[in-house]
Amino acid sequence: MGIKGLTKFIADTAPNAIKEIKIENLMGRVVAIDASMSLYQFIIAIRDGDQYGNLMNESGETTSHISGLMSRTIKLMENGLKPIYVFDGAPPELKGSELEKRGEKRQKAEELLIKAKAEGNLEEIKKQSGRTVRVTKKQNEEAKKLLTLMGIPVIESPCEAEAQCAFLTKYEMAHATATEDADALVFGTKILIRNLNANASSNKNKNKNSSKRGYILTEINLEQVLKGLKLTMDEFIDFCILCGCDYCDTIKGIGSKTAYNLIKEYNCIENIIKNIDQNKYQVPANFKYVEARQSFINPKVLEKSEVKIDWCEPKIEELKTFLIKEHNFNEVRVTNYITRLLKARKVTTQRRLDTFFTTCTKKSTKLIIEESQKEVLKTKGKGKKREINNDSSTKLNAKKKKTNVKDEKKNNEKVDELKNKSDENLVKDEEDDQDDYDQNIFDEKTNSESGNIKNENVKEDVSSNDITMDIPKCTNDIVC
């Protein structure tokens, strides 16, 4: 679920904290990805046929998560991004009540799905299918194996994946956390990226002009959130608990706006409870806000010394066996994936170097042009001054003026030459970028039947092999 209404409240109250970015803005960046959330999105988005069933192998086992994960990971790498996938561990005890509620919702959705199938209601089938999707323990293990064979770093969190992702940004081992769960901000991630997998498949019904905007992501900056809301991190955590989180109930009658006003006035939940009208606002009998607060401040995560991040060479033959023999993927398709994977690994490194040197070259050229222009103006000024102050030496002044004009002409030629050179570099860079972009575009059959993404966030329970959630419509050199 994340934090109820948090993203909208931030957008309304601290708009400078949220901005749209293109995936190109993450070129060369290490991004920690909430793997469980990604798998759910792939399973719900990649469907086969009108009945919205998952892609399956010959044994009837779902392969949508494998297809989606492989395709999206390669796509991210082709755009210069360096992904780290973080998997959930055991859910915290405080989350037990929330998991029970999710189980009840899933059971209700399964009943509605059966009814919709009996009636042939395709729209309802599509809606309820998404609500009954589960990411099993086996699917998680298959995803880990796939990523390992591809040479992509995999981290297994002792508890919540988004908490581990957040701490990777604190350790400066990652630039951002990619998840739809806004509670990553409460765990302290410096940057939250949403919609990283929103375009995991092409939707036949999406706006035809949307592709012109590029691959748009949402970036939320925690520092700007706190600055915009004028809250300390401790106050922000208490505010989010009052809004509604996975770890405890909240005070009835208090939404995000009221919670914010109360935190601004009283600073913490303890003071709020002491001062509010409890006839108007019902405080839960067993309000575990202290435990929830500690879960956000000191979550169960791997320490920096325990985290190992290695981008390894892909194990090509093992990868082929896993995809073709074990999961019945088309051999031609797999060969294409592997070719793109190997190329993307080179592109990721090369593009980072190209970006560095191109940036330096452009900057240096610009500075040289500016300095040359200043020299021209300086020369002009000196020439005029000599003419005014040296009337007694007319012939000498005339000679100097002639020299100045000659120098000015020479400097102007130098400026023009540098400008032309700069323009040529810029054009070349733009052409190279377009070539890279064109090479990244691909159309996969498995991605043609995507489900609509809904605006509600819920997390996975790995230990029970179960989740229920809806996907939102809408988000140093390592280099972090």
UniProtKB/Swiss-Prot annotation:
Enzyme Commission number(s) of this protein: 3.1.-.-
Comp. bias regions, Acidic residues: 429-438
Organism: Plasmodium yoelii yoelii
SUPFAM superfamilies reported for this sequence: 5' to 3' exonuclease, C-terminal subdomain, PIN domain-like
UniProt GO BP: base-excision repair; DNA replication, removal of RNA primer
InterPro entries assigned: 5-3_exonuclease, 5-3_exonuclease_C_sf, Flap_endonuc, HhH2, PIN-like_dom_sf, XPG-I_dom, XPG/Rad2, XPG_CS
Cofactor binding note: Binds 2 magnesium ions per subunit. They probably participate in the reaction catalyzed by the enzyme. May bind an additional third magnesium ion after substrate binding.
Binding of DNA, residues: 47, 72, 160, 244, 246
Annotated spans, Interaction with PCNA: 349-357
Protein origin, superkingdom: Eukaryota
Region annotation Disordered: where it falls in the sequence: 379-461
Lineage: Eukaryota, Sar, Alveolata, Apicomplexa, Aconoidasida
Bilayer-spanning residue ranges: none
Post-translational modification: Phosphorylated. Phosphorylation upon DNA damage induces relocalization to the nuclear plasma.
I-domain: region residues: 124-266
Residue numbers binding Mg(2+) 1: 34, 88, 160, 162
Subcellular location, record wording: Nucleus, Nucleolus; Nucleus, Nucleoplasm; Mitochondrion
Keyword set includes Phosphoprotein: yes
Binding residues for Mg(2+) 2: 181, 183, 246
Protein name: Flap endonuclease 1
PROSITE patterns according to UniProt: XPG_1
